[in-house]
């Protein structure tokens, strides 16, 4: 006979990024857990990035969230691959999938807003608190950390030995508004580094370009603009939200500890 008075397991998710928000909603759906979401007590700037997910992850979104606007997810059935030669870029391979989509791309800030509203609707307890030490979480049966690698709490549970590598490269990201027709997801293997194009609406796409960090010494905005002009064969575009991040490898031996 089921004990209706059985105490629910208390679980906390630390971090309110996409992974933290989705984890909180997924665990709350089980019904047998007391789920708390803990996030830093400060205001975040908008996450002006895009994310590409597989078809199975797209289906998972619909299992976790009651109502989700399909227009927020831009589907892709085709991926074009290009190679830069001396005087042109050649389309050397295409991936096509007629029966299903290969991936979906969405804008992080729009989906994050929906997830936060869903958490409020489900009445998942949200705690605004800066977690500096693991002992701050002692009252929970399980702790799930959805934090960045630089988090002090995260660093305290992992093995000190790790594999680190500085690729001496940066990833340049941004949005492009255009009037081109039939813009597909694409990967360009350029001499300066690989450039990925991820459409997220009819006339917008995000890009990620991995290049040598020495290029930061140049006028990076002009450099990026001229290369995208060249790749798209048009100057009728608008580039916005351009940012850059260092590319580094950081592999740990362990990512868990007891109830964490």
Which positions does each model-derived feature cover?
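Short, Lys/Arg-enriched N-terminal segments with co-localized hydrophobic residues
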Residues: 1-5
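Beta1/beta-strand and adjacent pyrophosphate-binding region of the FAD-binding site
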Residues: 6-19
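Glycine-rich FAD pyrophosphate-binding loop
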Residues: 12-14, 26-49
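Conserved Rossmann-like nucleotide-cofactor binding loop
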Residues: 19, 43, 150
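N-terminal glycine-rich dinucleotide-binding loop that anchors FAD/FMN and/or NAD(P) in oxidoreductases
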Residues: 49-71
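Conserved N-terminal helical subregion
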Residues: 59, 63, 74-172
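Conserved FAD-binding catalytic core of PHBH/FMO-like flavoproteins
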Residues: 149-244
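FAD-binding beta-loop-beta segment adjacent to the flavin cofactor pocket
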Residues: 245-260
């Amino acid at each position: 006979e089921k004990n209706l008075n059985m105490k629910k397991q208390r679980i906390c998710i630390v971090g309110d990024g996409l992974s933290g928000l989705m984890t909180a909603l997924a665990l709350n759906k089980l019904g047998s857990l007391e789920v708390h979401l803990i996030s830093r007590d400060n205001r975040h700037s908008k996450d002006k990035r895009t994310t590409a997910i597989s078809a199975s992850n797209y289906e998972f979104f619909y299992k976790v969230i009651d109502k989700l606007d399909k227009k927020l997810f831009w589907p892709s059935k085709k991926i074009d691959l290009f190679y830069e030669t001396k005087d042109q870029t050649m389309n050397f391979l295409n991936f096509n999938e007629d029966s299903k989509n290969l991936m979906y791309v969405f804008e992080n800030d729009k989906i994050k807003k929906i997830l936060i509203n869903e958490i409020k609707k489900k009445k998942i307890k949200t705690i605004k608190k800066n977690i500096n030490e693991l002992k701050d979480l002692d009252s929970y049966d399980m702790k799930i950390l959805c934090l960045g690698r630089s988090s002090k709490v995260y660093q305290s549970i992992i093995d000190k030995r790790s594999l680190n590598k500085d690729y001496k490269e940066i990833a340049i990201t941004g949005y492009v508004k255009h009037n081109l027709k039939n813009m597909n997801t694409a990967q360009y293997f350029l001499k300066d580094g690989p450039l990925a194009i991820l459409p997220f609406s009819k006339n917008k796409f995000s890009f990620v370009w991995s290049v040598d960090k020495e290029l930061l010494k140049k006028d990076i905005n002009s450099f990026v603009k001229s290369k995208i002009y060249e790749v798209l064969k048009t100057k009728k575009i608008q580039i916005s939200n351009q940012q850059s991040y260092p590319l580094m490898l950081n592999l740990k031996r362990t990512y868990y500890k007891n109830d964490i």
